[in-house]
């Protein structure tokens, strides 16, 4: 191939003295070239070396030849193009490339310039050979450039379409109308805006209707739509939203009502201190004792002590059965400690099961209407303040009943103090002394 190309070049450029038949004689020919064209010589100087290095790549001649012509036509081209394709062993063509370079210094080479068109055909023939080596990088370099815009153009429309589809799907699912998902988004947007534009009159009518019926039948819905100048769909959706809101409100209220319902059930118990007393007495194991005992206590003392019924107005209604009266006798003995209760004190012994609980629970027994803390504060306030006898009674009971300070509260029930104090003044020591051992035995 090289020889054929060389002979062709000699035939083409045979009229010129600088050409030689031997492809290796170009070294001598290149010497005049640098004087004529330094750029061409530079560009072609590197090529002959490459040509010597790789004579096998004859197929690359045509492209190199084309590059040389392009370099000659545009001076700026040679430095840029040769490095691109000059790196691979494309240089063997310089023998041919050299002849076209000289035409510039002499005028006659211009006619041969068209003749090089003949070698270009081989270039078209030879590129397949070069295709194995050179065109691949060029094509690879060009292919991404060509493919990237096309791929990008293909991707963007797909991405847009997918996003639109997703938007449509989401909007369709949100409105609950998947059937019209594709065309619905604009309609849905308008419908949503219309929903937010309900007038106060429309809202009032809708609220009234919802108050009577949470679910509308279709005839009523049509009627409402005609009355309110709304569509059935708007009314239906409004009722759906309103029902959801109602459910949320009911849940919140349910939590409050459940806690509130417990509180009222608890509230009646606290007003009657008996509930608190019951809890305390359950610990003392004197459940029957409860608040009921104080009211009977208040009743008999009225007869025995002549106390005014006004002192225990509240406990009286809460009083229940007479059995507390038996306990009352014990309570009276513990609380009043009067000589009249000496026999009742024996009754207290009879209430053996009651004795200790009374001592422990006496604070509760002190006042059905009064909580234990009140009874705790009560004894010193009433008993100690009114008479030393009551104080001594408290001391006697405290010593007599080591079971608990509860009996110390015993004088506390002396809220009917004045009478208690007067009565206790008559036989304070005897009654308490007699009661004390009995209580201790209990």
UniProtKB/Swiss-Prot annotation:
GO terms for cellular component: nucleoplasm; nucleus. Signal peptide: none annotated. A motif (Antp-type hexapeptide) lies at residues 155-160. GO terms for biological process: angiogenesis; animal organ formation; anterior/posterior pattern specification; blood vessel remodeling; cartilage development; embryonic skeletal system morphogenesis; gene expression; glossopharyngeal nerve morphogenesis. The keyword DNA damage does not apply. Residues 165-177, 187-196, 276-285 have a biased composition (Polar residues). Pfam families: DUF4074, Homeodomain. Residues 191-250 bind DNA. One of its GO terms (molecular function) is RNA polymerase II cis-regulatory region sequence-specific DNA binding. Residues 126-135, 300-309 have a biased composition (Low complexity). InterPro entries: DUF4074, HD, HD_metazoa, Homeobox_Antennapedia_CS, Homeobox_CS, Homeodomain-like_sf. Belongs to the Antp homeobox family. This is Homeobox protein Hox-A3. It comes from Bos taurus (Bovine). The gene is HOXA3.
């Amino acid at each position: 191939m090289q020889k054929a190309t060389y002979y062709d070049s000699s035939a083409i450029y045979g009229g010129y003295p600088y050409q030689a038949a031997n492809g290796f004689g170009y070294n001598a020919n290149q010497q005049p070239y640098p004087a004529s064209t330094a750029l061409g010589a530079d560009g072609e100087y590197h090529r002959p070396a490459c040509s010597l290095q790789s004579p096998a790549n004859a197929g690359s001649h045509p492209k190199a030849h084309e590059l040389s012509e392009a370099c000659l036509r545009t001076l700026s081209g040679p430095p840029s193009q040769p490095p691109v394709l000059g790196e691979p062993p494309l240089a063997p063509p310089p023998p041919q490339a050299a002849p076209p370079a000289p035409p510039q210094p002499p005028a006659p080479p211009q006619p041969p310039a068209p003749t090089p068109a003949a070698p270009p055909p081989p270039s078209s023939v030879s590129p397949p050979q070069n295709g194995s080596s050179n065109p691949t990088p060029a094509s690879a370099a060009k292919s991404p450039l060509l493919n990237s815009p096309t791929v990008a153009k293909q991707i963007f429309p797909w991405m847009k379409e997918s996003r639109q589809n997703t938007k449509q799907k989401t909007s369709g699912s949100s409105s609950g109308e998947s059937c019209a998902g594709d065309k619905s988004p604009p309609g849905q947007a308008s419908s949503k805006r219309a929903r937010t534009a309900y007038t106060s009159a429309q809202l009032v009518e809708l609220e009234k209707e919802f108050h009577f019926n949470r679910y509308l039948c279709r005839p009523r819905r049509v009627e409402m739509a005609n009355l309110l100048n709304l569509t059935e769909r708007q009314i239906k959706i409004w009722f759906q939203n309103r029902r959801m809101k109602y459910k949320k409100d009911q849940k919140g209220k349910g939590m409050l009502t459940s806690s509130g319902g417990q509180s009222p059930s608890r509230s009646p118990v606290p007003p009657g201190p008996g509930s608190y007393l019951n809890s305390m007495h359950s610990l003392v194991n004197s459940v029957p004792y409860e608040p009921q005992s104080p009211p009977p206590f208040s009743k008999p003392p009225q007869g025995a002590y002549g106390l005014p019924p006004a002192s225990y107005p509240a406990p009286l209604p809460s009083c229940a059965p007479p059995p507390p009266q038996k306990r009352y006798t014990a309570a009276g003995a513990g609380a009043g400690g009067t000589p009249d209760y000496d026999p009742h004190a024996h009754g207290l012994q009879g209430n053996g099961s009651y004795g200790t609980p009374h001592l422990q629970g006496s604070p509760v027994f002190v006042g059905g209407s009064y909580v234990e803390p009140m009874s705790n504060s009560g004894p010193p306030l009433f008993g100690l303040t009114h008479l030393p006898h009551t104080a001594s009674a408290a001391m006697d009971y405290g010593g007599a009943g080591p079971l608990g300070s509860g009996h110390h509260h015993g004088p506390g029930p002396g809220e009917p103090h004045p009478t208690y104090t007067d009565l206790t003044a008559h036989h304070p020591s005897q009654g308490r002394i007699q009661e004390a051992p009995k209580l201790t035995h209990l």
